[in-house]
Design a protein with these regions (language model features):
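Primarily marks hydrophobic transmembrane alpha-helices of the MFS/SLC 12-helix fold
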Residues: 72-75, 103
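C-terminal ends and interior cores of transmembrane alpha-helices
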Residues: 80-97
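Glycine-rich segments within core transmembrane alpha-helices of 12-TM secondary carriers
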Residues: 134-147
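Intracellular juxtamembrane helix-capping segments at the cytosolic ends
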Residues: 116-129
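MFS transmembrane alpha-helix packing/gate-lining sites
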Residues: 22, 54-58, 113, 147
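Central cavity-lining transmembrane alpha-helices of secondary-active solute carriers
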Residues: 46-64
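Hydrophobic core of transmembrane alpha-helices in multi-pass small-molecule transporters
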Residues: 99-116
Length: 147
C-alpha cells in the first residue's frame, strides 16, 4: 500500500490524541492511585512533574537526533513508547516490587513518547503539501482537545 499525504495528516491528527492521553490520563487517575496504593500527595504530584520533566529532556535531546535517525522511525518509536507507557499504568505497578516504582516507570515510558510526538508532529504537518497549511495546523492542534 502506498501512503499518501492524506494518510500522513490523519496519522498526525491521531498523534495529538495520543499526546493528550499521555498528559491527561494519569492525572485523572490520581485519586484512584491514592486509594488503591496509598500514595501520598507528594508521590502523586511527582508523577506529573516526572512526566513533563522527561518530555522536556526528550524535546531537547531529540531535536538533533531526529535529523540523523529520520522522522518515520522516531514517530514509530514515539507511539510504541506512548502505548507501552499507557499500558504500563495498568501492568507495571503489579510487576514491580513497589506500585509507585511501576507507575514511575510507566510515566517515563509514555513521557518519552509524548516528548517525541511534541517535537515531530508540527514539522511533519508543515511539510505536507496541503493547499491550506494554516487550516491543517489549526486542525492538528485542535485534536489535542479531542483527546
Amino acid at each position: 500500500m502506498r501512503f499518501k499525504d492524506s494518510h500522513t495528516l490523519t496519522a498526525s491528527y491521531l498523534s495529538l490524541i495520543t499526546q493528550a492521553a499521555v498528559n491527561n490520563l494519569a492525572p485523572l487517575l490520581l485519586l484512584t492511585f491514592r486509594a488503591q496504593w496509598g500514595l501520598s500527595l507528594e508521590q502523586l504530584t511527582l508523577l506529573t512533574t516526572l512526566n513533563f520533566s522527561v518530555q522536556l529532556v526528550v524535546d531537547l535531546l531529540s531535536a538533533k537526533a531526529v535529523d540523523k535517525i529520520g522522522y518515520r522511525p522516531c514517530m514509530i518509536a514515539a507511539h510504541v513508547l506512548a502505548a507501552a507507557g499507557l499500558a504500563g499504568l495498568a501492568a507495571l505497578p503489579a510487576i514491580f516490587g513497589s506500585a509507585y516504582a511501576g507507575l514511575m516507570a510507566a510515566v517515563v515510558l509514555y513521557a518519552m513518547g509524548g516528548g517525541l510526538i511534541e517535537v515531530l508532529i508540527s514539522p511533519i504537518v508543515e511539510a505536507c503539501p496541503t493547499p491550506r497549511k494554516e487550516a491543517a495546523m489549526s486542525l492538528l492542534h485542535s485534536f489535542y482537545c479531542w483527546g
